[in-house]
From Swiss-Prot:
CDD domains: Ribosomal_L11 (cd00349)
Name the record gives this protein: Large ribosomal subunit protein uL11
Organism the protein comes from: Brucella canis (strain ATCC 23365 / NCTC 10854 / RM-666)
Alphabetic keyword roster: Methylation, Ribonucleoprotein, Ribosomal protein, RNA-binding, rRNA-binding
Post-translational modifications: One or more lysine residues are methylated.
Amino acid sequence: MAKKVAGQLKLQVPAGAANPSPPIGPALGQRGINIMEFCKAFNAASQEMEKGSPIPVLITYYQDKSFTFVMKTPPVTYFLKKAANLKSGSKTPGKASAGTITRDKVRAIAEAKMKDLNAADVEAAMRMIEGSARSMGLEVVG
């Protein structure tokens, strides 16, 4: 018989750095999820990823207190800031430029994010990422 789903929880956890301290511990604990079990499973699953990169994770927890989780790729903004060597985007996008990024880098980001984006092809994914770049105050060149 199938397990009864009690709910879902979305978190953004640094790769390889899940620990029971806030905000992860309280978010899991109040839903009755075994915190240490999640931390061990997540850290093992995110070993191959770049240490410290923010990983969106969707946790489905069941009434019997068990859980499953699905890891996504890091957010587009993380990739854009990394590609443009920025700490943060522009405070006034459209007026002040935070930096530039080439179309080649946009294509690389689109290919990395393709499985998580709702895009038919790489060109559509590139347009989405260029929109995110403009929202951050980045200029797409090339």
